[in-house]
Amino acid sequence: MRLKDAIPKKGSQQRGRRVGRGISAGQGASCGKGMRGQKSRSGGSTRPGFEGGQNPLYRRLPKLKGFPMVNRKKYTIINVSKLSSLPANTEVTLASLIKVGIITTDDGPLKILGDGDLNIPLKVYAAAFTASARSKIEAAGGSCEEIGPAQAVSNEDSTKE
């Protein structure tokens, strides 16, 4: 195929509308724009976002600094200081904390934060630990084990084993 063989498809190229060339053309005098008014003038269109003079949407909404993450992980959080009320060598899971009454709501997988002191050894199973929480639990002689979010919210039967 050569460049001379590339011709446009029949009917694809139409001539532009010739306006203002007399009444016999069908687009004479006002060129199909009606009578008077802003829309009949040259350059007579409004800018994008113009709402006729009322306060536009982009000025009604506040200037937002960033936007919230759509897929943010939501955790049930608890500080190390709350775990100090448990007896020594207890297996700590989300289900056991709800059963004891330390946590009242299940907002998602368990995350241990490092605020406060801990001086009893515990076996803690959670979806996430902060670095300070992990160091405080291990310094007290306990152990930290990260489990997946699916295991963190599993039923109580699996925690009794």
Swiss-Prot record:
Q: Gene3D superfamilies per the record?
A: 3.100.10.10
Q: Which Pfam families match?
A: Ribosomal_L27A
Q: Where is the composition biased (Gly residues)?
A: 23-35
Q: What are the start and end residues of every segment in region (Disordered)? A: 1-57
Q: Which GO terms describe its biological process?
A: translation
State any single GO MF term.
structural constituent of ribosome
Return the GO cellular component terms, semicolon-separated. Answer: cytosolic large ribosomal subunit
Sorted alphabetically, the keyword list is: Ribonucleoprotein, Ribosomal protein, RNA-binding, rRNA-binding
Note the InterPro entries from the entry: Ribosomal_uL15, Ribosomal_uL15/eL18, Ribosomal_uL15/eL18_sf, Ribosomal_uL15_bac-type, Ribosomal_uL15_CS
KW ATP-binding (keyword) present: no
- Report the sequence similarity comment from the record: Belongs to the universal ribosomal protein uL15 family.
Q: What does this protein do?
A: Binds to the 23S rRNA.
User: What HAMAP family is this protein classified in?
Assistant: Ribosomal_uL15
Subunit structure, interactors included: Part of the 50S ribosomal subunit.
Q: What is this protein called?
A: Large ribosomal subunit protein uL15
Protein's organism = Trichodesmium erythraeum (strain IMS101)
